[in-house]
Design a protein with these regions (language model features):
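Bacterial N-terminal signal peptides that target proteins for export
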Residues: 1-9
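Bacterial N-terminal signal peptides
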Residues: 10-19
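Short helix/turn-capping signatures at newly exposed starts of structured segments
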Residues: 20-129, 149-163
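Low-complexity, intrinsically disordered Gly/Pro/Thr-rich segments
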Residues: 131-148
Length: 163
């Protein structure tokens, strides 16, 4: 019985020790998206056009990691790397929705910031003009959505894929 207790405690210690050392448990799944497409998803030019419309500006070039693409639609910017993988997006007008997996209809630029209260955004910085920068999901994931707000209204949302 004594050996069984030692074995049990050893197994528990092996399972718990990494979390104690690194100060965190396993990462929770975070599904940040723009119009249902999550960063890290491969998207072709034609798929982009069918989802977001024809871009006002499109640039592509070869890099050491494959094809890189930049799309601009209105004031919104999208970057794909490694042959079409969505890495970054910046939403600066109300054409597109983010976080559609978290809420019906998602969230748009121009929406009340209070719609995100249930996600417990963290204040990053307040600016002299009265605007503020918040971050979502920073405490539970490497993926984070940065939200800029003024007078309780969302001004823009930015996602950068963690490298």
């Amino acid at each position: 019985m004594k050996n069984l207790t030692k074995i049990f405690l050893s197994i528990v210690l092996i399972l718990v020790l990494p979390a104690m050392i690194y100060g965190q448990g396993p990462e929770k799944a975070v599904h940040i998206d723009v119009e249902g497409i999550e960063p890290g998803t491969k998207i072709t030019y034609s798929e982009f056009v069918s989802r977001f419309g024809k871009p006002d500006s499109y640039k592509k070039y070869e890099s050491e990691f494959g094809l890189s693409e930049r799309y601009i639609v209105g004031k919104n910017k999208f970057s794909c790397e490694e042959n079409g993988i969505l890495y970054n997006f910046g939403l600066h007008d109300n054409r597109f929705r983010a976080l559609t997996t978290y809420m019906d209809g998602g969230i748009r630029v121009g929406d009340p910031f209070s719609k995100l209260d249930f996600l417990k955004p963290d204040l990053v910085k307040k600016y002299d003009d009265g605007s503020a920068q918040y971050v979502l999901f920073e405490k539970i994931s490497d993926d984070k959505l940065i939200v800029f707000v003024k007078d309780g209204i969302i001004l823009s949302m930015v996602f950068n894929y963690p490298l």
